[in-house]
Amino acid sequence: MEVNILAFIATALFILVPTAFLLIIYVKTVSQSVE
């Protein structure tokens, strides 16, 4: 179970980090378009 939990955390970070990075770029692009 411990290994599965660590794998789940690693996978979650691997997915969330790039997603958050893309969201930040998207928000910046939209804000610039509105202006």
UniProtKB/Swiss-Prot annotation:
Keyword Glycoprotein in record: no
InterPro entries according to UniProt: PSII_PsbM (IPR007826), PSII_PsbM_sf (IPR037269)
Protein location: Plastid, Chloroplast thylakoid membrane
A biological-process GO annotation: photosynthesis, light reaction
TM annotation in the entry: 5-25
Keyword Ligase among UniProt keywords: no
GO CC list: chloroplast thylakoid membrane; photosystem II
Full protein name: Photosystem II reaction center protein M
Organism (species): Amborella trichopoda
